[in-house]
Amino acid sequence: MVRLPRKFKRVLLLVVLLTLVVFVRFKKQYIPTISVFEGSLIDNRDTLSYFNISNLEPSERSEWLPNKRVNAAFVTLARNEDLNDLLKSIRKLEKTFNHKYHYGWVFLNNEEFSDEFKEHVIEAVSGKCEFGLVPQEQWSIPEYIDQDKMHENWKKLQELGILYADKESYRHMCRFESGFFYRHPLVQKYEYYWRVEPSVDFFCDLDFDPFAYMKENNKAYAFTITVTEYSETIPSLWPSTKEFIKMHPNALHPNNALNFISNDDGETYNGCHFWTNFEIAKVDFWESEVYSKYFDYLDKSGNFFYERWGDAPVHSIAVSLFADRDNIHFFNEIGYWHPGSGHCPLDDATRAKCDCDPYESIDYNGWSCLDKFYTAFEMPFPENWSFYSH
Protein backbone atom coordinates (compact mmCIF):
# COMPACT_ATOMS: atom_id res chain seq x y z
CA MET A 1 0.00 0.00 0.00
CA VAL A 2 1.37 3.38 -1.08
CA ARG A 3 1.44 5.96 1.70
CA LEU A 4 1.11 9.62 0.77
CA PRO A 5 3.52 12.07 2.32
CA ARG A 6 2.02 14.02 5.24
CA LYS A 7 2.68 17.32 3.46
CA PHE A 8 0.76 16.11 0.40
CA LYS A 9 -2.19 15.08 2.60
CA ARG A 10 -2.37 18.57 4.09
CA VAL A 11 -2.33 20.16 0.64
CA LEU A 12 -5.06 17.81 -0.55
CA LEU A 13 -7.21 18.56 2.51
CA LEU A 14 -6.76 22.29 1.96
CA VAL A 15 -7.85 21.96 -1.68
CA VAL A 16 -10.98 20.04 -0.63
CA LEU A 17 -11.88 22.66 1.99
CA LEU A 18 -11.38 25.53 -0.44
CA THR A 19 -13.55 23.74 -3.00
CA LEU A 20 -16.36 23.37 -0.44
CA VAL A 21 -16.14 27.04 0.54
CA VAL A 22 -16.33 28.16 -3.09
CA PHE A 23 -19.26 25.80 -3.73
CA VAL A 24 -21.22 27.09 -0.71
CA ARG A 25 -20.58 30.72 -1.62
CA PHE A 26 -21.58 30.02 -5.23
CA LYS A 27 -24.86 28.45 -4.08
CA LYS A 28 -25.60 31.32 -1.71
CA GLN A 29 -25.00 33.88 -4.41
CA TYR A 30 -26.74 32.25 -7.34
CA ILE A 31 -29.41 29.82 -6.11
CA PRO A 32 -32.80 31.47 -5.38
CA THR A 33 -33.73 31.89 -1.73
CA ILE A 34 -36.28 29.14 -1.13
CA SER A 35 -38.26 31.15 1.45
CA VAL A 36 -39.20 33.60 -1.28
CA PHE A 37 -41.20 30.89 -3.00
CA GLU A 38 -42.78 29.06 -0.05
CA GLY A 39 -46.49 28.67 -0.61
CA SER A 40 -46.29 29.99 -4.16
CA LEU A 41 -47.44 28.13 -7.23
CA ILE A 42 -44.44 27.48 -9.47
CA ASP A 43 -44.59 25.19 -12.49
CA ASN A 44 -40.95 25.30 -13.49
CA ARG A 45 -38.16 26.87 -11.47
CA ASP A 46 -35.76 26.30 -14.34
CA THR A 47 -37.25 29.37 -15.99
CA LEU A 48 -35.98 31.54 -13.12
CA SER A 49 -32.57 33.15 -13.27
CA TYR A 50 -30.27 31.81 -10.60
CA PHE A 51 -29.63 34.67 -8.24
CA ASN A 52 -30.89 35.73 -4.85
CA ILE A 53 -34.08 37.75 -5.39
CA SER A 54 -33.58 39.46 -2.04
CA ASN A 55 -30.61 41.32 -3.50
CA LEU A 56 -32.89 43.21 -5.91
CA GLU A 57 -34.45 46.58 -5.30
CA PRO A 58 -38.12 46.16 -4.19
CA SER A 59 -39.37 47.76 -7.40
CA GLU A 60 -37.48 45.17 -9.48
CA ARG A 61 -38.62 42.00 -7.67
CA SER A 62 -42.06 41.49 -9.18
CA GLU A 63 -40.80 40.34 -12.58
CA TRP A 64 -38.94 37.43 -10.94
CA LEU A 65 -41.89 36.21 -8.89
CA PRO A 66 -44.05 33.22 -9.87
CA ASN A 67 -46.35 34.07 -12.76
CA LYS A 68 -49.29 32.51 -10.90
CA ARG A 69 -49.17 35.14 -8.19
CA VAL A 70 -52.58 36.84 -7.94
CA ASN A 71 -53.13 40.28 -9.44
CA ALA A 72 -53.51 41.95 -6.06
CA ALA A 73 -52.12 44.66 -3.80
CA PHE A 74 -52.38 46.14 -0.33
CA VAL A 75 -54.27 49.44 -0.26
CA THR A 76 -53.80 52.08 2.43
CA LEU A 77 -55.40 55.48 2.90
CA ALA A 78 -53.00 57.47 5.06
CA ARG A 79 -51.70 60.92 5.94
CA ASN A 80 -48.08 61.98 6.15
CA GLU A 81 -48.35 62.18 9.93
CA ASP A 82 -49.38 58.50 10.03
CA LEU A 83 -45.91 57.40 8.91
CA ASN A 84 -44.58 55.92 12.15
CA ASP A 85 -47.80 54.07 12.97
CA LEU A 86 -48.04 52.83 9.40
CA LEU A 87 -44.48 51.52 9.40
CA LYS A 88 -45.38 49.30 12.36
CA SER A 89 -48.28 47.84 10.38
CA ILE A 90 -46.15 47.31 7.30
CA ARG A 91 -43.28 45.63 9.13
CA LYS A 92 -45.59 43.19 10.91
CA LEU A 93 -47.46 42.25 7.74
CA GLU A 94 -44.19 41.82 5.87
CA LYS A 95 -42.85 39.62 8.67
CA THR A 96 -45.92 37.39 8.94
CA PHE A 97 -46.77 37.11 5.25
CA ASN A 98 -45.52 39.37 2.49
CA HIS A 99 -41.78 38.71 2.77
CA LYS A 100 -42.53 35.49 0.87
CA TYR A 101 -44.68 37.01 -1.88
CA HIS A 102 -43.67 40.66 -2.33
CA TYR A 103 -47.12 41.95 -3.23
CA GLY A 104 -47.15 45.65 -4.04
CA TRP A 105 -48.69 48.44 -2.05
CA VAL A 106 -50.94 51.36 -3.07
CA PHE A 107 -50.87 54.41 -0.80
CA LEU A 108 -53.57 57.06 -1.17
CA ASN A 109 -53.76 60.50 0.44
CA ASN A 110 -55.87 63.62 0.03
CA GLU A 111 -52.60 65.58 0.06
CA GLU A 112 -49.28 64.92 -1.65
CA PHE A 113 -47.12 62.42 0.20
CA SER A 114 -43.91 63.89 1.57
CA ASP A 115 -40.52 62.66 0.39
CA GLU A 116 -39.89 61.38 3.91
CA PHE A 117 -43.06 59.29 3.80
CA LYS A 118 -42.21 57.81 0.42
CA GLU A 119 -38.61 57.02 1.29
CA HIS A 120 -39.48 55.19 4.50
CA VAL A 121 -42.33 53.08 3.15
CA ILE A 122 -40.37 52.15 0.03
CA GLU A 123 -37.63 50.90 2.32
CA ALA A 124 -40.10 48.98 4.50
CA VAL A 125 -42.10 47.08 1.88
CA SER A 126 -40.79 44.16 -0.14
CA GLY A 127 -42.91 44.85 -3.23
CA LYS A 128 -43.32 47.92 -5.36
CA CYS A 129 -44.93 51.10 -3.98
CA GLU A 130 -47.42 53.32 -5.75
CA PHE A 131 -48.57 56.69 -4.44
CA GLY A 132 -51.84 58.31 -5.44
CA LEU A 133 -53.74 61.52 -4.75
CA VAL A 134 -57.43 61.53 -3.84
CA PRO A 135 -59.33 63.90 -6.17
CA GLN A 136 -60.49 67.03 -4.36
CA GLU A 137 -64.16 66.47 -5.23
CA GLN A 138 -64.01 63.13 -3.41
CA TRP A 139 -62.68 64.76 -0.24
CA SER A 140 -64.90 67.82 0.06
CA ILE A 141 -68.46 68.58 1.13
CA PRO A 142 -70.81 68.31 -1.89
CA GLU A 143 -72.74 71.41 -2.94
CA TYR A 144 -76.08 69.77 -2.16
CA ILE A 145 -75.27 69.49 1.56
CA ASP A 146 -77.01 71.99 3.85
CA GLN A 147 -74.08 72.86 6.09
CA ASP A 148 -76.20 74.60 8.72
CA LYS A 149 -78.23 71.41 9.11
CA MET A 150 -75.02 69.37 9.08
CA HIS A 151 -73.39 71.28 11.93
CA GLU A 152 -76.62 71.26 13.94
CA ASN A 153 -76.74 67.47 13.64
CA TRP A 154 -73.11 67.21 14.70
CA LYS A 155 -73.94 69.03 17.94
CA LYS A 156 -76.65 66.48 18.68
CA LEU A 157 -74.19 63.64 18.12
CA GLN A 158 -71.71 65.34 20.45
CA GLU A 159 -74.37 65.48 23.15
CA LEU A 160 -74.79 61.72 22.74
CA GLY A 161 -71.05 61.23 23.21
CA ILE A 162 -70.55 59.73 19.75
CA LEU A 163 -66.93 59.28 18.67
CA TYR A 164 -65.92 61.60 15.77
CA ALA A 165 -69.29 63.35 16.17
CA ASP A 166 -68.05 66.64 14.70
CA LYS A 167 -65.09 65.40 12.62
CA GLU A 168 -65.38 66.43 8.98
CA SER A 169 -62.24 64.53 7.93
CA TYR A 170 -63.64 61.30 9.38
CA ARG A 171 -66.73 61.68 7.24
CA HIS A 172 -64.63 62.30 4.14
CA MET A 173 -62.74 59.10 4.91
CA CYS A 174 -65.92 57.05 5.36
CA ARG A 175 -67.45 58.42 2.16
CA PHE A 176 -64.24 57.83 0.18
CA GLU A 177 -63.84 54.26 1.45
CA SER A 178 -67.52 53.60 0.72
CA GLY A 179 -67.69 54.78 -2.84
CA PHE A 180 -64.47 56.10 -4.35
CA PHE A 181 -61.33 54.18 -3.38
CA TYR A 182 -61.99 51.41 -5.92
CA ARG A 183 -62.38 53.97 -8.70
CA HIS A 184 -58.83 55.24 -8.27
CA PRO A 185 -56.69 54.28 -11.30
CA LEU A 186 -54.01 52.75 -9.05
CA VAL A 187 -56.59 50.39 -7.53
CA GLN A 188 -58.66 49.63 -10.63
CA LYS A 189 -55.88 47.66 -12.32
CA TYR A 190 -55.94 45.02 -9.56
CA GLU A 191 -58.33 42.11 -9.17
CA TYR A 192 -58.07 41.93 -5.37
CA TYR A 193 -57.00 44.29 -2.61
CA TRP A 194 -56.18 43.95 1.08
CA ARG A 195 -56.93 47.05 3.13
CA VAL A 196 -54.34 47.94 5.76
CA GLU A 197 -54.42 50.85 8.20
CA PRO A 198 -51.83 52.49 10.47
CA SER A 199 -51.46 51.16 14.02
CA VAL A 200 -52.71 47.65 13.31
CA ASP A 201 -51.02 44.37 14.19
CA PHE A 202 -50.88 40.89 12.67
CA PHE A 203 -50.33 38.07 15.15
CA CYS A 204 -49.96 34.91 13.06
CA ASP A 205 -47.41 33.62 10.56
CA LEU A 206 -49.32 32.72 7.41
CA ASP A 207 -48.28 29.61 5.50
CA PHE A 208 -50.70 30.32 2.65
CA ASP A 209 -51.59 33.21 0.33
CA PRO A 210 -54.97 34.78 1.24
CA PHE A 211 -55.19 36.37 -2.21
CA ALA A 212 -54.74 32.97 -3.86
CA TYR A 213 -57.33 31.46 -1.53
CA MET A 214 -59.82 34.16 -2.51
CA LYS A 215 -59.27 33.58 -6.21
CA GLU A 216 -59.18 29.78 -6.15
CA ASN A 217 -62.38 29.61 -4.09
CA ASN A 218 -64.25 32.37 -5.91
CA LYS A 219 -64.54 34.54 -2.79
CA ALA A 220 -65.65 38.15 -3.17
CA TYR A 221 -65.20 39.44 0.36
CA ALA A 222 -63.28 38.39 3.48
CA PHE A 223 -63.01 39.69 7.05
CA THR A 224 -61.49 38.89 10.45
CA ILE A 225 -63.64 40.93 12.86
CA THR A 226 -67.39 41.49 12.87
CA VAL A 227 -69.05 43.74 15.44
CA THR A 228 -72.19 45.80 16.05
CA GLU A 229 -72.46 49.39 14.85
CA TYR A 230 -73.60 52.26 17.07
CA SER A 231 -77.21 52.74 15.96
CA GLU A 232 -77.05 56.47 16.76
CA THR A 233 -74.59 56.99 13.90
CA ILE A 234 -76.75 55.41 11.18
CA PRO A 235 -80.44 55.98 12.05
CA SER A 236 -81.55 56.32 8.42
CA LEU A 237 -79.15 53.87 6.73
CA TRP A 238 -81.46 50.85 6.84
CA PRO A 239 -84.61 52.81 5.85
CA SER A 240 -82.62 54.21 2.90
CA THR A 241 -81.48 50.69 2.00
CA LYS A 242 -85.05 49.40 2.07
CA GLU A 243 -86.13 52.26 -0.19
CA PHE A 244 -83.34 51.36 -2.61
CA ILE A 245 -84.43 47.70 -2.66
CA LYS A 246 -88.00 48.73 -3.43
CA MET A 247 -86.70 50.71 -6.40
CA HIS A 248 -84.35 47.90 -7.49
CA PRO A 249 -85.88 44.57 -6.34
CA ASN A 250 -83.57 42.61 -8.65
CA ALA A 251 -80.55 43.95 -6.76
CA LEU A 252 -80.99 41.30 -4.06
CA HIS A 253 -78.92 38.21 -4.70
CA PRO A 254 -81.10 35.07 -4.51
CA ASN A 255 -78.54 33.49 -2.16
CA ASN A 256 -78.02 36.57 0.01
CA ALA A 257 -77.07 36.80 3.69
CA LEU A 258 -79.97 38.92 4.93
CA ASN A 259 -80.27 36.70 8.00
CA PHE A 260 -76.83 37.86 9.14
CA ILE A 261 -77.69 41.58 9.22
CA SER A 262 -81.34 41.33 10.24
CA ASN A 263 -83.08 39.34 12.97
CA ASP A 264 -86.59 39.92 11.60
CA ASP A 265 -86.38 39.11 7.90
CA GLY A 266 -85.33 42.59 6.87
CA GLU A 267 -87.70 44.73 8.89
CA THR A 268 -84.81 46.19 10.90
CA TYR A 269 -81.01 46.18 10.80
CA ASN A 270 -79.30 44.46 13.73
CA GLY A 271 -76.12 46.51 13.33
CA CYS A 272 -73.83 43.57 12.50
CA HIS A 273 -71.05 44.57 10.15
CA PHE A 274 -67.59 43.49 9.06
CA TRP A 275 -64.88 45.77 10.43
CA THR A 276 -63.49 47.24 7.23
CA ASN A 277 -60.15 48.41 8.61
CA PHE A 278 -59.28 44.86 7.57
CA GLU A 279 -60.91 43.53 4.43
CA ILE A 280 -59.77 41.50 1.44
CA ALA A 281 -62.10 41.78 -1.52
CA LYS A 282 -62.57 41.74 -5.26
CA VAL A 283 -62.37 45.19 -6.76
CA ASP A 284 -65.06 44.43 -9.31
CA PHE A 285 -67.70 43.80 -6.64
CA TRP A 286 -67.66 47.51 -5.83
CA GLU A 287 -67.50 48.34 -9.53
CA SER A 288 -70.70 46.40 -10.18
CA GLU A 289 -73.76 48.24 -11.41
CA VAL A 290 -75.83 47.36 -8.36
CA TYR A 291 -73.26 48.61 -5.85
CA SER A 292 -72.56 51.77 -7.85
CA LYS A 293 -76.27 52.59 -7.87
CA TYR A 294 -76.55 51.77 -4.18
CA PHE A 295 -73.68 54.04 -3.19
CA ASP A 296 -74.90 56.88 -5.40
CA TYR A 297 -78.36 56.59 -3.84
CA LEU A 298 -76.92 56.71 -0.32
CA ASP A 299 -74.57 59.55 -1.20
CA LYS A 300 -77.37 61.74 -2.54
CA SER A 301 -79.17 61.43 0.81
CA GLY A 302 -76.39 63.49 2.38
CA ASN A 303 -76.24 61.29 5.44
CA PHE A 304 -72.54 60.60 5.25
CA PHE A 305 -72.46 64.20 6.53
CA TYR A 306 -75.79 64.77 8.31
CA GLU A 307 -75.35 61.56 10.27
CA ARG A 308 -72.11 59.60 10.63
CA TRP A 309 -72.47 56.72 8.22
CA GLY A 310 -69.39 54.54 8.23
CA ASP A 311 -67.99 52.55 5.33
CA ALA A 312 -68.18 49.39 7.46
CA PRO A 313 -71.99 49.14 7.67
CA VAL A 314 -72.32 50.36 4.07
CA HIS A 315 -69.93 47.68 2.77
CA SER A 316 -71.39 45.00 5.01
CA ILE A 317 -75.00 45.63 4.08
CA ALA A 318 -74.07 45.65 0.40
CA VAL A 319 -72.06 42.42 0.60
CA SER A 320 -74.79 40.70 2.63
CA LEU A 321 -77.55 41.69 0.20
CA PHE A 322 -75.93 41.87 -3.23
CA ALA A 323 -73.29 39.12 -3.10
CA ASP A 324 -73.66 35.35 -3.03
CA ARG A 325 -73.35 34.36 0.63
CA ASP A 326 -71.08 31.48 -0.43
CA ASN A 327 -68.55 34.07 -1.60
CA ILE A 328 -68.16 35.68 1.83
CA HIS A 329 -65.25 34.32 3.89
CA PHE A 330 -64.04 34.54 7.48
CA PHE A 331 -60.23 34.40 7.69
CA ASN A 332 -60.02 32.84 11.13
CA GLU A 333 -56.34 32.04 10.52
CA ILE A 334 -55.34 35.72 10.38
CA GLY A 335 -54.79 37.01 13.91
CA TYR A 336 -55.40 40.75 13.80
CA TRP A 337 -55.59 43.74 16.09
CA HIS A 338 -56.90 47.25 15.50
CA PRO A 339 -56.84 49.80 18.34
CA GLY A 340 -59.70 48.76 20.58
CA SER A 341 -60.33 45.23 19.35
CA GLY A 342 -58.64 42.12 18.04
CA HIS A 343 -59.17 38.60 16.75
CA CYS A 344 -57.09 35.64 17.92
CA PRO A 345 -57.61 32.16 16.38
CA LEU A 346 -58.76 29.37 18.68
CA ASP A 347 -57.66 26.14 17.02
CA ASP A 348 -54.41 24.69 18.33
CA ALA A 349 -52.75 24.28 14.92
CA THR A 350 -53.13 27.98 14.10
CA ARG A 351 -52.39 29.25 17.60
CA ALA A 352 -48.98 27.62 17.41
CA LYS A 353 -48.14 30.18 14.71
CA CYS A 354 -49.55 33.16 16.63
CA ASP A 355 -48.48 35.42 19.48
CA CYS A 356 -51.91 36.47 20.75
CA ASP A 357 -54.18 35.53 23.66
CA PRO A 358 -57.70 34.26 22.80
CA TYR A 359 -58.92 35.69 26.11
CA GLU A 360 -58.25 39.16 24.68
CA SER A 361 -60.15 38.46 21.46
CA ILE A 362 -63.32 40.48 20.87
CA ASP A 363 -65.01 37.42 19.37
CA TYR A 364 -66.64 36.47 22.70
CA ASN A 365 -67.59 40.01 23.66
CA GLY A 366 -71.24 41.05 23.57
CA TRP A 367 -70.29 43.60 20.91
CA SER A 368 -69.13 40.88 18.52
CA CYS A 369 -71.31 39.42 15.77
CA LEU A 370 -69.14 36.38 15.12
CA ASP A 371 -71.57 34.03 16.87
CA LYS A 372 -74.32 35.49 14.68
CA PHE A 373 -72.15 34.87 11.61
CA TYR A 374 -71.57 31.21 12.51
CA THR A 375 -75.30 30.73 13.05
CA ALA A 376 -76.49 32.64 9.98
CA PHE A 377 -74.01 30.85 7.72
CA GLU A 378 -74.70 27.47 9.33
CA MET A 379 -71.05 27.00 10.22
CA PRO A 380 -69.86 24.85 13.13
CA PHE A 381 -68.53 26.77 16.12
CA PRO A 382 -64.86 26.18 17.00
CA GLU A 383 -64.32 23.20 19.29
CA ASN A 384 -63.43 25.26 22.36
CA TRP A 385 -65.74 28.21 21.66
CA SER A 386 -67.86 27.65 24.78
CA PHE A 387 -64.75 27.68 26.99
CA TYR A 388 -63.78 31.21 25.94
CA SER A 389 -67.27 32.64 25.46
CA HIS A 390 -68.21 32.33 29.16
Swiss-Prot record:
Transmembrane segments: none annotated. InterPro entries: Glyco_trans_15, Nucleotide-diphossugar_trans. Its EC number is 2.4.1.-. It comes from the Eukaryota. Keywords: Endoplasmic reticulum, Glycosyltransferase, Golgi apparatus, Transferase. GO terms for cellular component: endoplasmic reticulum; Golgi apparatus; Golgi membrane. This is O-glycoside alpha-1,2-mannosyltransferase omh1. The active site is at E279 (nucleophile). It is found in: Endoplasmic reticulum; Golgi apparatus. The gene is omh1. The keyword Glycosyltransferase applies. Belongs to the glycosyltransferase 15 family. Its main location: endoplasmic reticulum. It is an enzyme of class 2 (transferase). One of its GO terms (biological process) is protein O-linked glycosylation. GO terms for molecular function: alpha-1,2-mannosyltransferase activity. Gene3D superfamilies: Spore Coat Polysaccharide Biosynthesis Protein SpsA, Chain A (3.90.550.10). Mannosyltransferase involved in O-glycosylation of cell wall and secreted proteins. Plays a major role in extending alpha-1,2-linked mannose in the O-glycan pathway. Signal peptide: none annotated.
